[in-house]
Amino acid sequence: MARKPARMWRRLERPYTRTEYIDGAPGTRVRMFDMGNKSADFPVMLTLVAKEAVQIRENALEAARVVANKYVSRRAGASNYKLKLRIFPHHILREHKMAVGAGADRISQGMRAAFGKPVGRAARVKPGTKIMSVWVKPEHFEIAKEALRRAAMKMPTPTKIVVEKGHELLKGKI
């Protein structure tokens, strides 16, 4: 069965995270949360910040992580950056599957036992939540900024890119 559109789960409602009570809760699709040169210390830090309260599906998080990591590693080099995904998809999404097509009315139970089955995960985000951060050297500032801009395109919320560390090193670039 095809994936439902993300707009079905975008709005924040009540959280549903207790996996010990949920049979068949799916694992997360996000493969890595820390990428690049994890041990080095970089002077400039940029962060992608959410502007609205939404649920971000794990598919969108993984797509944003992949596109940002690929862009920075190819342009700046594998040892010249550190990238961290700062949110985790704890919230479990449920779907009440409905039968469609000819004869569906004979098979369907309607809204009886309509709680739904787990189909995926999402991260719950409030305004001002840091989604993703990149640490780089001052000469790779523009590359990191473009990587976060590309990652923002995968998000279901408006975002902003904030320079959290290294303002003094970026005179004329900000």
Swiss-Prot record:
GO terms for molecular function: structural constituent of ribosome. Signal peptide: none annotated. One of its GO terms (biological process) is translation. The keyword Metal-binding does not apply. PROSITE patterns: RIBOSOMAL_L10E. One of its GO terms (cellular component) is ribosome. InterPro entries: Ribosomal_uL16, Ribosomal_uL16_arc, Ribosomal_uL16_CS_euk_arc, Ribosomal_uL16_dom, Ribosomal_uL16_euk_arch, Ribosomal_uL16_sf. This is Large ribosomal subunit protein uL16. Belongs to the universal ribosomal protein uL16 family. CDD domains: Ribosomal_L16_L10e. The keyword Ribonucleoprotein applies. Pfam families: Ribosomal_L16. Keywords: Ribonucleoprotein, Ribosomal protein.
